[in-house]
Amino acid sequence: MKPMHPGGFLEVITGPMFAGKTTELIKRVERQIFAKRKAALFKPAIDNRYSEREVVAHNGLRYEAFVVPTTEKGVERIKEITLNEGYEVIGIDEVQFFPMSVVEALNELADQGIYVIASGLNLDFKGDPFPVTKELLVRADNIVYLTAVCTVCGKPATRSQRLIDGKPAPRNSPVILVGGRESYEARCREHHLVPDE
């Protein structure tokens, strides 16, 4: 068993779209920078909704980030940059888009004394768990579960409703579709719909 270095910690921020996950990630990283810890953010290259080079929350909050591909090489790049540049704190946005190897990589970084904060969706638009987030949740030292507000009734929303031409996307739609308010809404369990066709 590897010894746990002081300061190593794996934290996961999760919930549906529009719950404030990216905002919370940026706030936590900024807090560590204020505490004089060397910190960096990473984002998947697939997420270019608002910026090519920044992590950007739906509310407009933004922070410069390393952009890495959602491949095994991208996961290795996260480790290399973190260790070679001496980062004490790293944040990874939209972690659900990375391959499963990111789970072990982030766990190893935490074991080496890095404070790792991963932010990502827990469920896809059908209500099924994202495998990467699911695995990170069982390994996390701390879990921050955020809810949004249902766009139909105003109750706490725990689901991400995918829309196509303003209507719920059918079950056979592709799982990955990077988008914002034009493609998704936050919904409660009662108002989350996934038609078969």
UniProtKB/Swiss-Prot annotation:
Its EC number is 2.7.1.21. GO terms for molecular function: ATP binding; thymidine kinase activity; zinc ion binding. It catalyses: thymidine + ATP = dTMP + ADP + H(+). ATP binds at G15, P16, M17, F18, A19, G20, K21, T22, D93, E94, V95, Q96. It is an enzyme of class 2 (transferase). Signal peptide: none annotated. One of its GO terms (cellular component) is cytoplasm. Zn(2+) binds at C150, C153, C188, H191. Its main location: cytoplasm. Keywords: ATP-binding, Cytoplasm, DNA synthesis, Kinase, Metal-binding, Nucleotide-binding, Transferase, Zinc. The active site is at E94. One of its GO terms (biological process) is thymidine metabolic process. It is found in: Cytoplasm. It comes from the Archaea. InterPro entries: P-loop_NTPase, Thymidine_kinase, Thymidine_kinase_CS. NCBIfam families: PRK04296.1-1. Homotetramer. This is Thymidine kinase.
